[in-house]
Amino acid sequence: VRMLRRVWNEIKSWYMRELVRDKGRLEDIVEYSSNVLKIIDGIEFEEFSSNILVYFATMKNVEIVGEAAYMLTKEFKASHPEIPWKQVEGMRHVLVHGYSQVLPRILWATAKENIPEIKAQVEKYLNETDWEHYCGE
């Protein structure tokens, strides 16, 4: 019984640490999604695609959103299938490993259409979860 209790406590401790990490990753997704929306606010595609600073700032922030999603636990992603996690992670992989293949229109569509949806959904998760219960905050 002691052994089972110790194993259970270790599993529970690991799980709580992962929840804390997931919360931080979700906060990163919101922060960097917000950056994307600020960067592209009030501009049209032509300026986006011709302004190297705007383009690469958007690219880097979308990449970080994808990295944060990639680092979420499998359990969290499985329990929140409303977001297409594989596609978010896939965009990150393309940006990191094949950025010359990213067409400005694809990045623009991601920033304009997908990022606001992802941000809203993640904010909802953050607000609806009782983090104090899980993380002792």
Q: Regions from the language model: what does each represent?
A:
Residues V1-E137:
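Solvent-exposed interaction patches of small proteins and small membrane subunits
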